[in-house]
Curated annotation (Swiss-Prot):
Its EC number is 3.5.1.44. It catalyses: L-glutaminyl-[protein] + H2O = L-glutamyl-[protein] + NH4(+). Transmembrane segments: none annotated. The keyword Cytoplasm does not apply. It comes from Burkholderia thailandensis (strain ATCC 700388 / DSM 13276 / CCUG 48851 / CIP 106301 / E264). The lineage of its organism: Bacteria, Pseudomonadati, Pseudomonadota, Betaproteobacteria, Burkholderiales. CDD domains: CheD (cd16352). This is Probable chemoreceptor glutamine deamidase CheD 1.
Amino acid sequence: MSGLPIATNLYFDAHFHRRGVKLLPNEFYTTREDMVLVTVLGSCVAACLHDPIARIGGMNHFMLPDDGADPSAAASESMRYGAYAMEVLINELIKAGGRRERFEAKVFGGAAVLAGMTTINIGDRNADFVRRYLALERIRITAEDLQGVHPRKVAFMPHTGQAMVKKLRVQAPDVAEREAALAREAAGPRGERAARARPRVELFGTPAPKAQATPRIELFGTRATQPATRKQEA
C-alpha cells in the first residue's frame, strides 16, 4: 500500500442501532456522523481523536514496523511511519473542521500477543509510541487501555467521543495470526509511506452513563467500571 487507506467496510451495527465502520490494520476513518467505528486490536494500537466543539472524530489502527533501530529514535523508519499514521488522522480531522488544540485522545491496544517476535515486545513499542507522540503534539489523553495480554474489541462514537472496550480471550488465534502476518509485512520496506510522514471509555452491553468529570473505562456486557488511566497534566 502506498498510503494509509480509509476504511471501507461499512455495515449496520445491530448492537448500537446505527451505521458502523469496521477498521482493519493500517486503516483510518473520520466522520461527524452519529455512527460507530469498530476495530479489534492485539499488539496494534488505535488512537481515537475527538473535537468536542466541532463534534467530529476519527480512529486509526496501526502497528509500527520493526526496522531494527532504537524504537525511541525519532529518525527511525518505524517512528516516521507511526508519525505518518497519526498525522493522516489529525490532518483529515482538521480538513473536516476540527481544531488540533481541542482534540482529545483515547488510546487502546498494545497487548503482548506477539511477544518474542522482536527484540522488544511489539505491543509495548506501539503503546509507548502513541503516548509519546500525543504528548509531543500536546493532545490530551483522556482515557487509555493499553498493554497487558488481552486482545481488545474497541467501539468509538466519533460524534460524542464515547468509547467502549471489550477484552477478548488471551488465546485468540485469529487475532494472533492476523497480527503475525502484519508484523512480517511491516518488517519489509516502508519507504514510500515513511517518506510522506513528515471522555470516556465504556464496555459493550452497558447503559451509557451520564456525563461525569472523570473518564471511565467500562467493559462490554458488564456493569463493572474502573477508573481510566490518565496522564499527569503538565
